[in-house]
Amino acid sequence: QIPANMIERIEVIRGGGSALFGSNAIAGTINVITKNPIKNEAQAGVVSSLIAGKAADVVSSLNGSLISDNYTRGISFHALHRARQSYDANGDDFTEITRLRNLNVGAKLFNDFTDRHKLTGEVNMSNENRRGGNKLDEPEHLADIAESIRTQMVGGTANYEYFSPAYNHKFTAYASGERTRADN
């Protein structure tokens, strides 16, 4: 859910059990590396569509960046909201496509204290609610068939880089964390 214009590169690391990512990275990892902002800018957009001419699907997005005059401090941010109505293709009162509410927001900040000291922080939040089946406006236990997913995720990273005076050594300290809650 990160806008393409904010992505610097994507790293694919094959294989499991990496010392860096732990034993849960069974098949490998995919890392999305975001850009540091280089200019002040903002973009906004809305895409609206209809599923079979009946169910609305609206995606709104905003992203941008602010940077100091001397390019030593900056922030980039992004937000996306999606609202999709449920869709019943055959009129049996059961959804073929679930109702969806999704909100994703994030920001990346950086501060270059000097040429040799740099601090970067990133935070992302996602909240998604899906509901399908029938009797969508009632609790799931009152429906004949219910598909329901509620997911909340908050994650962040911090990275500090130090270069030696001769720039022949580099020290990096990195920390990350994530909290995910899923109710299905």
Question: What residue spans do the PLM features occupy?
Answer:
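Outer-membrane beta-barrel pore domains and translocons
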Residues: 15, 33, 45-51, 78-84, ...
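Gram-negative/organellar outer-membrane beta-barrel architecture
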Residues: 55, 69-71, 75, 79-86, ...
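Outer-membrane beta-barrel architecture
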Residues: 39-43, 57, 72-74, 118, ...
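Flexible loop and strand-edge segments within Gram-negative outer membrane beta-barrel domains
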Residues: 84-104, 110-112, 116-171, 177-184
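N-terminal periplasmic accessory domains that precede
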Residues: 1-3, 12, 24-48, 58-62
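Residues that define the transmembrane beta-barrel architecture of outer-membrane proteins
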Residues: 3, 24-26, 54-60, 99-103, ...
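Transmembrane beta-barrel domains of outer membrane proteins
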Residues: 13, 33, 63-67, 78, ...
